[in-house]
From Swiss-Prot:
Positions carrying Phosphoserine: S37
Family as reported in the entry's similarity comment: Belongs to the adenylate kinase family. AK3 subfamily.
Modified residues (N6-acetyllysine): K34, K64, K80, K174, K189, K203
UniProt protein name: GTP:AMP phosphotransferase AK3, mitochondrial
Catalytic activity: a ribonucleoside 5'-triphosphate + AMP = a ribonucleoside 5'-diphosphate + ADP; GTP + AMP = GDP + ADP; ITP + AMP = IDP + ADP
Source organism of the structure: Pongo abelii
Segments for region (NMP): 37-66
Length: 227
């Protein structure tokens, strides 16, 4: 089956540590579509001091979640610049009201959901330790320091970011699940949800790749490259 000539409107979902960033990056390398990350968009608007950026920063500074209407305005404003392209939304929608607002503006064709067991994600995230002065990152499983808890170059102690501590990771994963469950159910009912389950990104990726080959053209310079 050949890729459809119609522009693709896609969303990618996955918990923190699910490999969503890696998969999104591979998708944009192999396929002709624009990747729109709500996190990058947010940082860019805050940096440029746009109206939405200033508004979002005020909520973040108070330790509050950015309201649905602000996130929706941010995403829809940017999507207006991408009407001629296929696109992949990453980090939006995160809540049911956001999904419904997006639906009123665009017909979503497919939602790629990366389903990685929480225990695997917990191991991935809690294995990360950093050397604060240099920003060097170690992973206890894939890239361990020569001496446990010590930076290879300076001999200084490594620390674990608050976000990477087991209790924080569990809270983040639970919050993600609570927030996105209604969104996944919403897309499931619409018949556009495609869930890819696995514990390793490299093993999940070929299935995502094969699925998208039927949906969107490949980039010409990468068309002959094996994923």
């Amino acid at each position: 089956m050949g890729a459809s000539a119609r522009l693709l409107r896609a969303v990618i979902m996955g918990a923190p540590g699910s490999g969503k960033g890696t998969v999104s990056s591979r998708i944009t390398t192999h396929f002709e579509l624009k990747h729109l990350s709500s996190g990058d968009l947010l940082r860019d608007n805050m940096l440029r001091g746009t109206e939405i950026g200033v508004l979002a920063k005020a909520f973040i500074d108070q330790g509050k979640l950015i309201p649905d209407d602000v996130m929706t305005r941010l995403a829809l404003h940017e999507l207006k610049n991408l009407t001629q392209y296929s696109w992949l939304l990453d980090g939006f929608p995160r809540t049911l009201p956001q999904a419904e607002a997006l639906d009123r503006a665009y017909q979503i064709d497919t939602v790629i959901n990366l389903n990685v067991p929480f225990e695997v994600i917990k191991q991935r995230l809690t294995a990360r330790w950093i050397h604060p002065a240099s920003g060097r990152v170690y992973n206890i499983e894939f890239n361990p320091p020569k001496t446990v808890g010590i930076d290879d170059l300076t001999g200084e102690p490594l620390i674990q970011r608050e976000d990477d501590k087991p209790e924080t990771v569990i809270k983040r994963l639970k919050a993600y699940e609570d927030q996105t469950k209604p969104v996944l159910e919403y897309y499931q009912k619409k018949g556009v949800l495609e869930t890819f389950s696995g514990t390793e990104t490299n093993k999940v990726w070929p299935y995502v790749y094969a699925f998208l080959q039927t949906k969107v053209p490949q980039t010409s310079q990468k068309a002959s490259v094996t994923p």
